[in-house]
A protein has these predicted regions:
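Short glycine/proline- and aromatic-enriched beta-strand/turn motifs that initiate or cap beta-hairpins
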Residues: 23-80
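Membrane-embedded beta-strand positions of outer-membrane beta-barrel proteins
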Residues: 29-31, 64-68, 112-114, 154-156, ...
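Transmembrane beta-strands of outer-membrane beta-barrel pores
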Residues: 33-39, 68-76, 102, 116-122, ...
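Solvent-exposed loop/turn segments connecting transmembrane beta-strands
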Residues: 39-45, 123-129, 160-169, 182-198
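Residues that define the transmembrane beta-barrel architecture of outer-membrane proteins
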Residues: 44-48, 88-94, 127-135, 167-171, ...
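Residues on the lipid-exposed face of transmembrane beta-strands in outer-membrane beta-barrel proteins
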Residues: 50-54, 96-102, 135-141, 158, ...
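Repeated loop/turn-to-beta-strand initiation elements of outer-membrane beta-barrel proteins
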Residues: 58-65, 107-110, 144-154, 182-185, ...
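Outer-membrane beta-barrel translocator/channel fold
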Residues: 68-94, 102, 190-259
Length: 259
């Protein structure tokens, strides 16, 4: 089942902990709270997210990464809909991450990640319908610490996600450029932003991005007489964000915007 919503106000609050050698691929730890009320409606979308990755150094500049991520999505649907909303009230997305990254040469780091996923309402026992497989391979050229006028980072990759409905990998591109001491730009999907740095602690950013979810309904619902086994939501978000760096590796984010 797909449902489109507009005029949604979004707020996010999260903590992120990262290690510089691995931050190009993933955070090491993250806590996040998202709240999205629907405009002119009592409907609400709330997401709680927790992420933890544990890197194991195998050799110099080589890491094996094990981790997991849990998303709990709470849908408070108060409007009248032509279907039973009770089975949709709580969704769970659980990822298990296995990754490996190493320096290919002086300029390029290579990484790969496999992510088995459980995405379901979890009303009953887990079945094969609740299981999905995601993954990706990436090449990163990071010159942010280089002694050049405009440091940059380029990430190229291929990602595979069984929930997209496309049986082939999709390209991934992200480009970051430090324009000057106060400004930086990041272009890519699912998020692009322009950031202004007041100092080493405080920064403000304008961003656009994509968000959403896909999950299996263990207790199917019916829409216009047809059985529906899955639910998905895709949103485009634009807004402003504020970052506060407690340390080089611990960051507080707050975001507000609309879709």
């Amino acid at each position: 089942m797909k449902k489109n919503q507009a005029k949604i106000f979004l707020t996010l609050l999260l903590f992120s902990f990262c290690f510089s050698a691995l931050a190009q691929l993933t955070d090491l730890a993250r806590l996040e709270y998202s709240f999205i009320p629907k405009g002119k409606s009592e409907d609400q979308y709330t997401r709680l997210r927790a992420l933890l990755n544990f890197p194991i150094k195998t050799k110099e500049d080589m890491y094996l990464i094990f981790g997991g991520e849990y998303n709990r999505i709470i849908l408070n649907l108060e409007d009248n809909y032509p279907f039973d909303t009770e089975p949709l009230s709580t969704l769970n997305v659980i990822d298990f991450n296995i990754g490996y990254t190493f320096m290919w040469n002086e300029n390029w780091r290579v990484g790969a990640k496999i992510t088995p996923r459980i995405a379901s309402t979890l009303n009953e026992k887990i079945t094969s319908e609740d299981l999905f497989l995601n993954g990706g391979v990436y090449a990163i050229k990071d010159r942010r610490d280089a002694d050049i006028k405009r440091p940059y980072r380029l990430i190229l990759g291929l990602t595979y996600n069984t929930t997209t409905g496309m049986p082939f990998p999709l390209p991934f591109v992200n480009y970051f450029r430090q324009v000057n001491e106060n400004w930086s730009l990041s272009l890519g999907v699912p998020k692009s932003n322009a950031t202004y740095y007041f100092n080493d602690k405080h920064s403000l950013e304008a961003f656009v991005g994509l968000d959403g979810y896909f999950a299996h309904l263990q207790r199917p619902t019916s829409v216009l007489g047809k059985q529906v086994d899955n639910i998905s939501l895709s949103i485009a978000v634009a807004g402003l964000g504020y970052d506060y760096n407690f340390t080089d590796h611990l960051v507080l984010y707050t975001y507000a915007g609309c879709t």
